[in-house]
From Swiss-Prot:
Name of the protein described by the UniProt record: Snaclec B8
Cystine pairings recorded for this chain: C2-C13, C30-C124, C99-C116
Keywords for this protein: Disulfide bond, Hemostasis impairing toxin, Secreted, Toxin
Subunit organization: Heterodimer; disulfide-linked.
Keyword Nuclease: no
PANTHER family, per the entry: MANNOSE, PHOSPHOLIPASE, LECTIN RECEPTOR RELATED
Organism of origin: Macrovipera lebetinus
Keyword Secreted on entry: yes
Highest taxon of the lineage: Eukaryota
GO cellular component, one term: extracellular region
Gene3D superfamilies linked: Mannose-Binding Protein A, subunit A (3.10.100.10)
Other information: Shows greater sequence similarity to the beta than alpha subunits compared to other heterodimer snaclecs.
Length: 130
């Protein structure tokens, strides 16, 4: 089972954190909260729907960090989730942005490229402990 204050969905635990921080600090915080924890990676529309139901009533924030980041931008523009899940599609990357979030203006359904040093709320996820 998930920790008492986390929500369970499809074999994962999720928790919305209502304080704003940089992408790196949010990812580090998630790894400290649960074994195998990371910023949320989104692999299906069902997971998006669950995340919206979970996050929107709590946050009502314009932007929320997700676990997507461009690594080694100047060499090969490798893009991937922090938990190494497969990336189903690639959003457009804007020069000077390496991190991604979800935008409330689109119902948290659009990935937006953001500067990693800005501070936003975030959602952590981990596998359900065995």
């Amino acid at each position: 089972d998930c920790p008492w204050d986390w929500s369970s969905h499809e074999g994962h635990c999720y928790k919305v954190f209502k304080f704003a921080t940089t992408w790196e600090d949010a990812e580090k915080f998630c790894t400290e909260q649960a074994r195998g924890g990371h910023l949320i990676s989104i692999k299906s529309t069902e997971e998006v729907d669950f995340m919206i139901k979970l996050a929107y009533p709590i946050l009502k924030a314009n932007l929320v960090w997700i676990g997507l980041r461009v690594e080694d931008f100047w060499r090969d523009c490798h893009m991937g989730w922090r938990d190494h899940a497969n990336l189903l599609s690639k959003p457009g990357v804007v020069h000077n942005t390496k991190c991604f979030g979800l935008d409330q203006k689109t119902g948290y359904r659009t990935w937006v490229a953001l500067r990693c040093e800005l501070a936003y709320h975030f959602i952590c996820m981990s596998r359900v402990p065995r």
